[in-house]
Amino acid sequence: GMKVRGVYERSDAKVREQEGMERKKGFIGEEFPTKVLIQENGVKYYVDVAEGQKTGFFLDQKYNRLAIQKLCKGGRVLDCFTHTGSFALNAAVAGAEKVLGVDASALGVEQARENAALNGMDETVQFICEDVFELLPKLEREGEKFDVVILDPPAFTKSRNSVKNAVKGYREI
């Protein structure tokens, strides 16, 4: 079997404090570079397990990313809330003509651009750092059209108190 030298623990979500649990983050066992290279569905990614959003890469979305490949060949694709570009890059692998990935996080967009370069997709995929809620009406006014629009927003609520605002946010997009 595989011998594990070290693990990077990310038990640092704010919800742990709400549940009365300690927030922890760091190495268990041997230390290693926290920026790791992974491959999924024919796409390579750099994932920063220490500084990335949550765990840095959402493994539970593997089959959704694969499903996107079936929809995008030859099309123009808009990937909203792109994070590190995983849906956008899967669209490009599938043969999308042009892909625009949008995220409000400068760090996420920087990582997405790095992942596009890693896969030789800099020409097909463009990533911009903008607020999706401001960009969508602007694209509509400019007459931009897309064959596929990917909406994978972050959670708009983490508690009952903000459900009303969350529903408003989901309706808006």
Where are these regions (language model features)?
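Non-catalytic substrate-recognition/targeting regions of SAM-dependent transferases
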Residues: G1-F57
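Conserved class I S-adenosyl-L-methionine
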Residues: G74-H83
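Conserved SAM-binding motif I beta-strand of class I
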Residues: K98-D103
